[in-house]
Amino acid sequence: MEYYVVHQLNGEVTGRNRPFAALTVEPEDTLDLLVAGDSESYNSVSTMRLWDDKGITTYDCGQGAQRIPETYYMLKHAFKKQSPKIVILETNTLFRDIGAVKSTQEILTQAGQYYLPVFRYHNLWKTVVDEPEMHTNYKGFVIRDEVAPYEGKPDYMKKKKKCETMPEYVKVYLEKIEELCEKNNAQLLLVSMPSPKNWNHKRHAEIQKYADGKGITYLDLNKKVEELGLNWAEDTQDKGDHLNVYGAEKVTSYLGNYIEENYELEDHRNDPTYEAWNQLAEQYKQNLASIKGKIEVAKETGVGK
């Protein structure tokens, strides 16, 4: 019943519910990599670039302002049909503290929606579209062509002595995510996407300390801005909060090489079973080419879209 309803609605579902619906109708055991987290995740990893460069099948299953209970149940939902080798967890979501009472309510809500999925989908017949129609979804990634330069301090990752502590309920759910990945033979990779507005050394230090203590791989791309070739005058859509598609392409190119060097994933590009990915990637390239002119104009004039 759940599969039928979601399959019928998937093309109409947008916003926070879309990843749940879309993951439900993805062919079984076809995804190599899942990317979870808040909006930093799905604005930073271009699924079609990873496919075109490395033949890696990726789904961005993040949600705007996704909280850690949502992350956990999103991944638990995904593991019902998928066997990804890697789960990337974007770390900005690990600092969302909603308070003890609200966090308890959040946990109960997410648990209920996971075990009784009709609660999640019961309003989808009258879904309100909250994404602009012009944005096409590519396995969770959406091309963002806005340009709004970051004009803050370039040394936003300057070392600080103190750490910023993760909320306790976040640590509980992070451990549950670790256990979930281990149970499903997926390697957990913590990644901090470049974001001067959201990230700093205090947060980096906290995640690094946690990762070292747990033996989890942690990659902070805020420490690699020059290596990535990021230009904060051109590669952000909203003054350093999120990357635009130019920034996402640079980050994804780096991630693809990093994954190739550190993990063993099969290249599916010549596998006829995955021909739909080649077709979607071609559509992505055509769409990307059509908007590059607009971005170039924005870069030259210094005015965002």
Task: Go through each PLM region and give its residues.
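Conserved, well-ordered alpha-helix/loop/beta-strand core segments that scaffold catalytic motifs
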Residues: 86-96, 145-228
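Membrane-embedded segments
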Residues: 36, 40-117
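Second-shell loop/turn segments in exported
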Residues: 35, 60-64, 161-167, 191-197, ...
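Histidine-centered active-site loop/cap adjacent to the catalytic His
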Residues: 236-273
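Alpha-helical transmembrane signal-anchor/signal-peptide segments
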Residues: 4-25
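Secreted/periplasmic serine-hydrolase-like ester/acetyl group-modifying domain
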Residues: 100-187, 268-305
